[in-house]
Amino acid sequence: MSAARESHPHGVKRSASPDDDLGSSNWEAADLGNEERKQKFLRLMGAGKKEHTGRLVIGDHKSTSHFRTGEEDKKINEELESQYQQSMDSKLSGRYRRHCGLGFSEVDDHDGEGDVAGDDDDDDSPDPESPDDSESDSESEKEESTEELQAAEHPDEVEDSKNKKDAKSNYKMMFVKSSGS
């Protein structure tokens, strides 16, 4: 250690040329065995130069390469656009927004006074939705259609069922109120 101090006295600048001492950054002088091991070491340390092996394309494999025709591309794009439009229409209309919060639900008025904003559809107009969307109808919509059929046959019974429905919703609301007041 004292020999190292004598060769490099404190406070004296060293020359820019490397001495016989090997620094920690001189990896190429390390004896790692054959050239392959040396390249692996340099690659793992992040100092190795990567050899360019050619163009690598993700998914470019014989088993996965399936090229679509222009017609298939158009068909897929049209389906995606129609699905997007349907979802945006239903989101903006608020038609399928049945739950407003924990324990709260939308009250449907059949008189036409409490229509949801943006829901200007008449009941007589056909829905622009595909037949696949008919499977996703909620139970409340099915109940409404059965009530409309009953209204044509027995108007007095429908009023009673509406009153019962309102009483049920009020009864549910009593349990939802906060217990702090």
Swiss-Prot record:
Organism of provenance: Bos taurus
Region Disordered, residue ranges: 1-181
Record-listed cross-link Glycyl lysine isopeptide (Lys-Gly) (interchain with G-Cter in SUMO2), residues: K13, K62, K75
Keyword Ubl conjugation tagged: yes
Protein name as it appears in the record: Small acidic protein
Comp. bias (Acidic residues): 106-147
Regions that span the bilayer: none
Residues found modified as N6-acetyllysine: K172, K177
Keywords noted in UniProt: Acetylation, Isopeptide bond, Phosphoprotein, Ubl conjugation
UniProt family annotation: Belongs to the SMAP family.
Top-rank taxon, per record: Eukaryota
Residues with PTM Phosphoserine: S15, S17, S63, S87, S125, S145
Pfam families reported for this sequence: SMAP (PF15477)
Ranges of biased composition (kind: Basic and acidic residues): 48-78, 151-169
Gene of this entry: SMAP
